Amino acid sequence: MPFLKIQTNQTLSETESKSLAAKSSALVAEQLGKPERYVMTSVETNTAMQFAGNDEGLAYLELKSIG
């Protein structure tokens, strides 16, 4: 089961988060050649994050897939 976790320090509405999760699910399924019914996505917003000493808008994506 492919799993995509998206974390961002940006604030998104519930509608935006759900839309991002849905679009990401379809993209992962397409790119990996897997049925979307096996794909799981998670969106975490407003997370305390920093990169290179800077906390401007950023996101971290982690994709796990076996097989």
Listing of model-derived features with the role each one plays in the protein:
Residues M1-G67:
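Interaction-mediating elements
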